[in-house]
């Protein structure tokens, strides 16, 4: 049956948001075209007919960029879009996180949500349009989904909050917050900020949630009008008789095992109990071992959550608001420009800071305006950090997301290009993992920059907060470890300085949390951050006053912008010659600022002298000691300084008549000449005769 096309509109932050259904991608379970300004995103949701035999919910969320959306053709030989950009990967995670908690417990059908950006307006966020589209595609489909959800961007300009700020407004904003949630609660936060106090961040989140409620009402109307009836699906459930039987065999032993303080010893104790129980069912073909295993994990989860919420006991014996033992060190690696090692319990990160010339910036060319990035933070998570083996691959979504979070946390304290004309790359190597590795990498990266001599505005530390909510019992945990993250309800990462917050990231596994829990988590995080900063500053109290001897030295000079082409030369001939002769890197800005960099200060100075000679202006009436470079019948060409020469006509070589140029000068001779004129073609006319006359006149006056 042919679906009827429907269109719905609402004003969203001063721009029109339009949703179209029933025309595109009609074979998907749900599909909508979302138009926001001139941005257009097609969002679809599909699900497998049968559940998968998996211990987890197989959900995939993809945000896909098409360069035609920005009127661009992909580069390279293939001329097709390649692997997703970092922005697309982060957008996929941004949409996935608020959607994932809202599917029924035990739902195992494979679900795929895809948003394709088909047209992009830089002032109308395609990510926010895709989030609304993904929620709507699920809401109008027959796939079980306890939404809708919505998300908005919040900025703050001159103390006033702004919904979905434009590009120009974002430049002036000290907050860049994305908040998502349901009508009743918030379930995802992602933010960067310029040392903003916790109470302001909380108000920004609540301000965003008020706008979310309006968008959800809009979606509910659409779903009521065009939505399909939800399919009755089989939710995975365990046999209650089997569960009771397994509990009798394992419950008491597992309760003791989960309270072993050390991570690996605790894992070994839990696995020993599980293996013992599983062995009793190995010969029983009527009982699936996967189901027994699921029951055993359920018992562990219940006991850990009960201990935390009711008895206020954590797996490693800490208090609810207690941080694990801390250690901070710098200068770990001798030849790197800066290094920092941060350890928190059984989580350890080693960060390395590398300084480069401004020519080492990363060029970002996607759907947005081409930009360059001079500060980068990369995060690596090798398998040995958790004592396991596994394939070695490039960075996945998680690594890219954690690297971006660290970058967002540290960016507000990076010195300006004028104050510190370097490209800065940080690489965080996670060496041990037991929760909060992204926050450990932020602490280690701060230490590495201070060790490298980067004049950061203030040190930054990060901490991860957790939540376990069971009936009327609620516990907000400071500095969560791996088990608390896996079995808890929230992972709320907060990074900042003593002054305020620089980054937030919140993911939850329940439908949402309220203001009171957010407020408590932010305050506990602030207190924890102060303790961590104290520990870091014991290792290094301020950035080193000098850079590493192995870091490039950068010399800055300014020339007349009109002279830039002279420094570059035809087809880059001049600048390439300077680089070849001195071994330096040269970066030239449009305003005439030149950055010369190398490890050798002498070579920097040599390159500067060459450039100074190139841009030096010849002044009429001035005398110069030049070198004869070429001889013609009509005169001699004399180089006054590097890149600038002039002609001494044969008649201007001497006071007496000259028959042959070689009678007076030869190539390589140094002669004193005077600039007589510069013609309208820029040619310089010189005279040796005028110099001789002035010298003769001066001698006569001295004799008198």
UniProtKB/Swiss-Prot annotation:
Q: Which Pfam families match?
A: KH_1, PNPase, RNase_PH, RNase_PH_C, S1
Domain named S1 motif: residues: 621-689
- Enumerate the subcellular locations listed in this protein's record, separating them with semicolons: Cytoplasm
A Gene Ontology biological process annotation? Answer: mRNA catabolic process
Q: What is its main location?
A: cytoplasm
Q: Which domain of life is it from?
A: Bacteria
Protein residues bound to Mg(2+):
485, 491
Q: Outline the extent of the KH domain.
A: 552-611
Q: State a GO cellular component annotated for this protein.
A: cytosol
The reactions it catalyses are:
RNA(n+1) + phosphate = RNA(n) + a ribonucleoside 5'-diphosphate
Tell me its cofactors. Answer: Mg(2+)
The UniProt family comment states: Belongs to the polyribonucleotide nucleotidyltransferase family.
User: Entry's NCBIfam families?
Assistant: polynuc_phos (TIGR03591), PRK11824.1 (NF008805)
Task: Tell me the protein's name.
Answer: Polyribonucleotide nucleotidyltransferase
Q: Which gene encodes it?
A: pnp
């Amino acid at each position: 049956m042919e679906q009827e096309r429907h269109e719905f509109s609402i004003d969203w932050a001063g721009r029109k948001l339009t949703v179209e259904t029933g025309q595109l991608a009609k074979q998907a379970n749900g599909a909508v075209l979302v138009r926001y300004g001139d941005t257009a995103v097609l969002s679809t949701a599909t699900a497998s007919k049968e559940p998968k035999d998996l211990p987890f919910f197989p959900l995939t969320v993809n945000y896909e960029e098409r360069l035609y959306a920005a009127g661009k053709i992909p580069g390279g030989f293939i001329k097709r879009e390649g692997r997703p950009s970092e922005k697309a990967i982060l957008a996929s995670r941004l949409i996935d996180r608020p959607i994932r908690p809202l599917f029924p417990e035990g739902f195992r059908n494979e679900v795929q949500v895809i948003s394709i950006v088909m047209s992009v307006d830089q002032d109308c966020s395609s990510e926010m349009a895709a989030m609304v589209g993904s929620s709507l595609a699920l809401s109008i489909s027959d796939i079980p989904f306890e939404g809708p959800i919505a998300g908005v961007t919040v900025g703050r300009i001159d103390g006033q909050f702004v919904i979905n700020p434009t590009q120009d407004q974002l430049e002036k904003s000290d907050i860049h917050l994305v908040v998502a949630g349901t009508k009743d609660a918030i379930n995802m936060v992602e933010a960067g900020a310029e040392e903003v106090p916790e109470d302001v961040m909380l108000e920004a989140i609540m301000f965003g949630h008020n706008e979310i409620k309006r968008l959800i009402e809009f979606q509910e109307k659409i779903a009521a009008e065009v939505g399909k009836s939800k399919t009755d699906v089989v939710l995975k459930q365990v046999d209650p008789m089997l569960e009771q039987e397994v509990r009798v065999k394992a419950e008491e032993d597992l309760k003791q095992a989960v309270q072993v303080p050390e991570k690996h010893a605790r894992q070994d104790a839990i696995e020993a109990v599980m293996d013992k129980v599983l062995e009793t069912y190995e010969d029983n073909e009527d009982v699936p071992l996967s189901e027994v295993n699921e029951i055993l994990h359920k018992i562990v989860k219940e006991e850990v959550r009960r201990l935390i919420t009711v008895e206020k006991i954590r797996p490693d014996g800490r208090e609810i608001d207690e941080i694990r033992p801390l250690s901070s060190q710098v200068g770990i690696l001798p030849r790197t420009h800066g290094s920092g090692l941060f350890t928190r319990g059984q989580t350890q990160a080693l960060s390395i800071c590398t300084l480069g010339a401004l020519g080492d910036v990363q060029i970002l060319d996607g759907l947005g305006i081409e930009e360059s990035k001079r500060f980068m933070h990369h995060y690596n998570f090798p398998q040995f950090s958790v004592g396991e083996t596994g394939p070695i691959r490039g960075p996945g979504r998680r690594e890219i997301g954690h690297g971006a979070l660290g970058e967002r946390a540290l960016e507000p304290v990076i010195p300006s290009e004028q104050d510190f004309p370097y490209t800065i790359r940080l690489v965080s190597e996670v060496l041990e993992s037991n929760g909060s590795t992204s926050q450990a990498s932020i602490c280690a990266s701060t230490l590495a920059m201070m060790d490298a001599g980067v004049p950061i505005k203030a040190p930054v530390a990060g901490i991860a907060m957790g939540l376990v909510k069971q009936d009327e019992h609620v516990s907000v945990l400071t500095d969560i470890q791996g088990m608390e993250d896996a079995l808890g309800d929230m992972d709320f990462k907060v990074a900042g300085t003593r002054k305020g917050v620089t980054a937030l990231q919140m993911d939850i596994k329940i439908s949402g949390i309220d203001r009171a829990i957010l407020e408590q988590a932010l305050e506990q995080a602030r207190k924890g951050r102060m303790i961590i900063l104290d520990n870091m500053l014991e290792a290094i109290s301020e950035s080193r006053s000098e850079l590493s001897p192995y870091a490039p030295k950068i010399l800055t000079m300014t020339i007349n912008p009109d002279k830039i082409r002279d420094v570059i030369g035809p087809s880059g001939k001049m600048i390439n010659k300077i680089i070849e002769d001195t071994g330096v890197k040269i970066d030239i800005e449009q305003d005439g600022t030149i950055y010369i960099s190398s490890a050798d200060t002498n070579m920097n100075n040599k390159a500067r002298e060459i450039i100074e000679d190139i841009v030096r202006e010849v002044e009429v009436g001035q005398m110069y000691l030049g070198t004869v470079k070429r001889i013609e019948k009509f005169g001699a060409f004399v180089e006054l300084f590097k890149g600038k020469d002039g002609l001494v006509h044969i008649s201007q070589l001497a006071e007496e008549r000259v028959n042959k140029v070689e009678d007076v000068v030869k190539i390589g001779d140094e002669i004193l000449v005077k600039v007589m004129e510069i013609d309208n073609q820029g040619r310089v006319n010189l005279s040796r005769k005028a110099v001789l006359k002035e010298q003769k006149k001066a001698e006569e006056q001295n004799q008198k």
